[in-house]
């Protein structure tokens, strides 16, 4: 199945919604804000502005909205070397921990990964994630780190060592370091960019575990490198497992994301158990904490 991914500005998002309104279909993925099926292609618009076209006619439909076919050629060429790719999941969710994964992928892995349908975890359903993540964990060398909400709240605050960016630098660096310590030799190390290279390097100076290999931060790297896509999927599965465990711990279904539903559930937890319940399952510095407290007034 052909898959085309592009970024849509607000104008293009509105055009997609208008043009394809009569072809609208339902979609259970919480990250999908609009979906449609037309002429052999499924169109998915995500909260991030990511626009995905899937199906035999994906390229043709995508070109109507500005996709240029030649753009795809460079990404396959850039992967013909051993690569370590990293990604994180959970940084945008009030509830749940922060999962960071580094994966080592070589060209010989590509056929298997494409057969599994590996892609950016945000374009896959949770069911698909849960299905293929265990297969990836067995087949691909990787290091997975999970910072629980409780630990996150201990290290991320104005009075502590980290902020929301520096803690991700620490986790990405540690995951890569552990893979390198195992003897893997990538020709390139790619991080799905969450800050500027300059900012990353400034925070990196504070880390104990250092290595000499050059790091590249690229936006939308999960769409360009299979190693990053693998990490995205494993990290997403780890985050979902943690979110389910935390839901069991507190007796409430904890939603992913940081929307109004998170405010409502947080206010229910505050009323039932107090702030200690949120310390256990949520990232307290998010605005949701104050919004939840306001709902109780």
From Swiss-Prot:
Residues binding a divalent metal cation are 87-88, 192
Under which EC number(s) is this enzyme classified? 3.1.26.4
Q: According to its UniProt record, which reaction does this protein catalyse?
A: Endonucleolytic cleavage to 5'-phosphomonoester
MF terms per GO, please? magnesium ion binding; RNA binding; RNA-DNA hybrid ribonuclease activity
Name the Pfam families for this protein: DUF3378, RNase_HII
The UniProt function text for this chain reads:
Endonuclease that specifically degrades the RNA of RNA-DNA hybrids.
What's this protein's name? Answer: Ribonuclease HIII
């Amino acid at each position: 199945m052909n898959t085309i991914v592009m970024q849509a500005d607000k104008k293009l998002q509105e055009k997609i919604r208008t043009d394809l309104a009569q072809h609208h279909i339902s979609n259970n993925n919480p990250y999908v804000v609009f979906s449609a099926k037309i002429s052999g292609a499924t169109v998915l618009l995500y909260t991030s502005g990511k626009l995905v076209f899937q199906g035999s006619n994906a390229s043709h439909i995508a070109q109507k909205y500005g996709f240029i076919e030649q753009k795809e050629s460079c990404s396959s060429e850039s992967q013909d070397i051993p690569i370590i790719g990293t990604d994180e999941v959970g940084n945008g969710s009030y509830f749940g921990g922060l999962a960071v994964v580094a994966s080592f992928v070589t060209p010989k892995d590509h056929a298997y990964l494409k057969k599994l349908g590996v892609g950016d975890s945000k374009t896959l359903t949770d069911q698909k994630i849960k299905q293929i993540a265990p297969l990836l964990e067995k087949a691909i060398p990787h290091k997975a780190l999970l910072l629980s909400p409780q630990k996150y709240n201990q290290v991320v605050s104005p009075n502590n060592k980290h902020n929301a960016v520096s803690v991700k630098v620490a986790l990405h660096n540690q995951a890569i370091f552990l893979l390198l310590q195992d003897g893997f030799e990538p020709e390139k190390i790619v991080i799905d960019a969450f800050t500027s290279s300059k900012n990353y390097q400034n925070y990196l100076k504070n880390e104990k575990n250092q290595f000499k290999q050059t790091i590249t931060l690229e936006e939308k790297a999960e769409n360009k490198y299979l190693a990053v896509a693998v990490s995205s999927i494993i990290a997403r599965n780890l985050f979902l497992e943690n979110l389910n465990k935390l839901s069991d711990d507190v007796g409430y279904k904890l939603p992913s994301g940081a929307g109004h539903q998170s405010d409502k559930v947080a206010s229910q937890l505050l009323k039932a158990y107090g702030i200690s319940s949120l310390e256990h399952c949520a990232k307290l510095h998010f605005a949701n904490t104050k919004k939840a407290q306001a709902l109780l007034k």
